[in-house]
Amino acid sequence: MIKILNKSFKPRLKARIRQNRRVLNKNLDNFFEWVKGAELIELQECNVEEDPVRPELSNEFRTGYGRKIFGVKYRGEIHAVMCFAYTNEIPRTVDELEKMSHDAYLQSTLRDQNIGRIAIAYTVWSKKKGGGMLIVKEVFKKI
């Protein structure tokens, strides 16, 4: 009895595994397809409630002196966001980040319009898999 079940079961199992493998490969291709059509844009504001790292920071802070917000847009929807600041030193706290980015901005207005030497990404988040890595690569290509 077991031999009969074993003989009929093995081919069906192998066929099902092959079919599942095809479906899985197709789904993986579709999973990252959105990355190819995404574009990097500079944002004037973002939904701070979605920020898992620093939701306490306002949009005014994020777009203040020497600070910018970038997003990855795909089909009219933002899928990843990155906030960063230009500074001349590496800050240890958010207060230091604010002071250093403001200072770097003021120095740039008096000099040659080069805002800070260091770009600090102080918050990055993504709604889709692969979005965080994509936005980091694209923003640092741009700056």
Residue ranges of predicted features:
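Hydrophobic, Leu/Ile/Phe/Ala-enriched alpha-helical segments that form helix-helix packing faces
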Residues: V35, V72, V139-I143
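A short helix-loop-beta-strand connector motif used in the catalytic cores of GNAT acetyltransferases and
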Residues: N59-A80, A85-V94
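Flexible, charged surface loops at secondary-structure boundaries
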Residues: R62-Y65, Q113-G116, I143
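Conserved acyl-donor/pantetheine-binding loop and adjacent beta-alpha core of acyl/acetyltransferases
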Residues: Y86-A119
